[in-house]
Amino acid sequence: MAAPPKAWKAEYAKSGRASCKSCRSPIAKDQLRLGKMVQASQFDGFMPMWNHARCIFSKKNQIKSVDDVEGIDALRWDDQEKIRNYVGSASAGTSSTAAPPEKCTIEIAPSARTSCRRCSEKITKGSVRLSAKLESEGPKGIPWYHANCFFEVSPSATVEKFSGWDTLSDEDKRTMLDLVKKDVGNNEQNKGSKRKKSENDIDSYKSARLDESTSEGTVRNKGQLVDPRGSNTSSADIQLKLKEQSDTLWKLKDGLKTHVSAAELRDMLEANGQDTSGPERHLLDRCADGMLFGALGPCPVCANGMYYYNGQYQCSGNVSEWSKCTYSATEPVRVKKKWQIPHGTKNDYLMKWFKSQKVKKPERVLPPMSPEKSGSKATQRTSLLSSKGLDKLRFSVVGQSKEAANEWIEKLKLAGANFYARVVKDIDCLIACGELDNENAEVRKARRLKIPIVREGYIGECVKKNKMLPFDLYKLENALESSKGSTVTVKVKGRSAVHESSGLQDTAHILEDGKSIYNATLNMSDLALGVNSYYVLQIIEQDDGSECYVFRKWGRVGSEKIGGQKLEEMSKTEAIKEFKRLFLEKTGNSWEAWECKTNFRKQPGRFYPLDVDYGVKKAPKRKDISEMKSSLAPQLLELMKMLFNVETYRAAMMEFEINMSEMPLGKLSKENIEKGFEALTEIQNLLKDTADQALAVRESLIVAASNRFFTLIPSIHPHIIRDEDDLMIKAKMLEALQDIEIASKIVGFDSDSDESLDDKYMKLHCDITPLAHDSEDYKLIEQYLLNTHAPTHKDWSLELEEVFSLDRDGELNKYSRYKNNLHNKMLLWHGSRLTNFVGILSQGLRIAPPEAPVTGYMFGKGLYFADLVSKSAQYCYVDRNNPVGLMLLSEVALGDMYELKKATSMDKPPRGKHSTKGLGKTVPLESEFVKWRDDVVVPCGKPVPSSIRSSELMYNEYIVYNTSQVKMQFLLKVRFHHKR
């Protein structure tokens, strides 16, 4: 689930309706309240649990840091100070506090293992370090600081009374005393520079006060004063300016609230080209900001309005119908003219203010960055990560691939996490890289100690989001249970299926009225807001026509704990009316627009319907499929059981992190998958287009396209697709989903589908005949498999179990033209997932559709083959638990080949060439090649170094761009023997 922006929220109560969660008494309107952000149980989002501020202040250690409080800089200064004082810091952004000298320690660092609590950088061995252990710190260990960092937050510390003072050298003592004197001197100077502000003239807040030169050693960084060494030597001066600024803003807002109506506020905002939407408190904020600092220019990304919140200016608009605009700035563009008041206004307060207005406006002073954000550039990445809690993560890793495991270990160690080579009771989680081996000793130990076992995607999300995330949605054990028990059970009646959560799937059906099928599955993913929601809407009619119900179910994708459902009985007419009302409310479009696929337009912040294809009516039910005899050969019968095993498809969907709790297995329509390809292609174009668009614009458009993809293809863990590797993975996932969609119509994933395996075999429209193990073809294929294992593929060996000859309906007729007219025909390998083979056998090998991105294809979109078996076997994606895969041997008419030594983007080879060959550095020994059926070459020689120099390819690849150049000849059932 998405993490809340901050753990706490501070504001003045909008009404008097909320009650304090601590004392249970009402929180009066305009009273300061503090809300702890928690995951809502009834909707996909976070909600504040409101408390009186005084109730929180009466408890210890509730708020860990000022940085954890959203909206603190929008409060009155006195209320800001109350929160800072509670946390224990006299300045915004720090979480340290003063402590009695007897509880403080000073010493020479014996090693470089500790990090400074303020700046998060390492404390070098032999340097002076200080600590102030407080009761509020709890059992976290001693918080150590650099000397400079300690005196910034405790400038008046009596260091001579610290424990360990006498152990320092005379030189170190002099250095410490000089630091104390310097810091005290700076504070005294700052205190003496305070001036009393005029109470009568709002505009007396002069630009000179905000733009005066900074003290030596500081630089301006995006509107904030930051010391390049990580210490802000003018923090007291900034605090003074922030106090004066806050007092001035609140004086102005109080005056506007007293003397200006909400309608006049909107008129004033409209006169200055500002956003006029929202409640009165938002209007007051925008007006006060504009009157004091000048009217804001439009967002450079989407041209919508900007507003100030949480230390920066953010866009209030949408970059597209799929996403909110993510643009933000600390130095927004301001309109270089006076702030206008409504034309013809008679409001004395506004007219008096307008006459006193100065043309030159001051620049808004922003709160200083937190210590972890203001460090040196060299340590910015590490500081950010450790400040968010990755330095607290204790983990161990298990996996079949040591290279992948070591890569993740290094990434997390770089981020500050603590790696354990073995599972011990103190670690937080065990990270599984690749398939989980249930027999692994570390896995068994983790289960015994009840340590969460999480998938490797958890690491990537932690690193991307720069913090330690909850384990719940990444637990591999939970996902396995979900795949077994939470996949929706579909009982198709007519043209649709009643949702099983309604409890009516056995006695009722979805209402159909002519062409209308009153069933909708809606989805919405917004990565900027952390939203990943679904909404199911159905009209359910009893089979006897006696009653009608409107059923709705909603929640967060992949979570059974968040959401709810409702079943309401009503007449047929009322049910249709209510269904259409809810559809309009959730999507912003009429039901008729979706049915007719005309004038339907995705609306910002609204759901989008998914195309769910339940297929046609099934064959008549049979009583007991297990008792039915099969006419298929035993080897073929076992193959059909492999191909039509529903659990295999469920496992694939789980691997892809597709939402199976609300998305019927295999029912995502072809149209939806094509739209998913289009979204990926848009992302690919944005990733390539680095010159023509500003970074902020490109980022917003990438977020919008990612939202679009994960709305169309519901996923448990949506994220922003930022790189080519991730894009390629998603494209391959969609290709696999296409085959699963095809398989769903043949396999029959419905719970009451009971066709025999013979019936399903007939639906493949492909003659499949097992070969005798003593036949010439079988022996040749076995030799080909055993000889052509590449030397670098050492993790497994291959054993041939069965070979089947193939004759797909119509394929030979299409191939005959190329067979007769092209020379250079070869029998080549092709590997694919088990879940893809129903689609392959029934429709042949297919080239990626035009709407798919070209990412991941070395030589463009085509059909790829290999002459070394292990090169293709990699794409079977088998594991220890399911070690049997399927492979193809196809006759490929290559003709004249376009030979290349490195990846080259193309749609097809040049004129006169019929295929492309990527030249590898290791090839089959040509002297061992044999001819099959007179003119087809079988490159079954052992791998040897080639004569090709400077090639970027390890092994040969063969690519054709026309499916008619391929004739599938053999299907192989292969067992993988994993060596580790």
Curated annotation (Swiss-Prot):
According to the entry, every stretch annotated as the WGR domain falls at: 507-607
Q: Domain named PADR1 zinc-binding: which ranges?
A: 230-368
BRCT domain residues are: 385-476
Q: Where is this region: Zinc ribbon?
A: 294-338
Ranges of biased composition (kind: Basic and acidic residues): 198-212
Q: What is its main location?
A: nucleus
Query: Which residues does the UniProt record annotate as the domain SAP?
Result: 257-291
Give the keywords, sorted: ADP-ribosylation, DNA-binding, Glycosyltransferase, Metal-binding, NAD, Nucleotidyltransferase, Nucleus, Repeat, Transferase, Zinc, Zinc-finger
GO molecular-function terms, A-Z: DNA binding; NAD binding; NAD+ poly-ADP-ribosyltransferase activity; NAD+-protein-aspartate ADP-ribosyltransferase activity; NAD+-protein-glutamate ADP-ribosyltransferase activity; nucleotidyltransferase activity; zinc ion binding
- The enzyme's main class, written as a single word, is transferase
Q: Where is Zn(2+) 2 bound in this sequence? A: 116, 119, 146, 149
ZnF (PARP-type) residues: 8-91, 104-184
Residue ranges occupied by any PARP alpha-helical domain in the UniProt entry: 629-748
One GO biological process term is: response to abscisic acid
Which reaction(s) are listed as its catalytic activity? NAD(+) + (ADP-D-ribosyl)n-acceptor = nicotinamide + (ADP-D-ribosyl)n+1-acceptor + H(+); L-aspartyl-[protein] + NAD(+) = 4-O-(ADP-D-ribosyl)-L-aspartyl-[protein] + nicotinamide; L-glutamyl-[protein] + NAD(+) = 5-O-(ADP-D-ribosyl)-L-glutamyl-[protein] + nicotinamide
Record's SUPFAM superfamilies? ADP-ribosylation, BRCT domain, Domain of poly(ADP-ribose) polymerase, Glucocorticoid receptor-like (DNA-binding domain), WGR domain-like
Q: Where does Zn(2+) 1 bind?
A: 20, 23, 52, 55
Instruction: Please give the family membership noted in the entry.
Output: Belongs to the ARTD/PARP family.
Task performed by this protein = Involved in the base excision repair (BER) pathway, by catalyzing the poly(ADP-ribosyl)ation of a limited number of acceptor proteins involved in chromatin architecture and in DNA metabolism. This modification follows DNA damages and appears as an obligatory step in a detection/signaling pathway leading to the reparation of DNA strand breaks.
Q: What is this protein called?
A: Poly [ADP-ribose] polymerase 1
Which species does this protein come from?
Zea mays (Maize)
Q: What is this organism's lineage?
A: Eukaryota, Viridiplantae, Streptophyta, Embryophyta, Tracheophyta
What gene is this protein a product of? PARP1
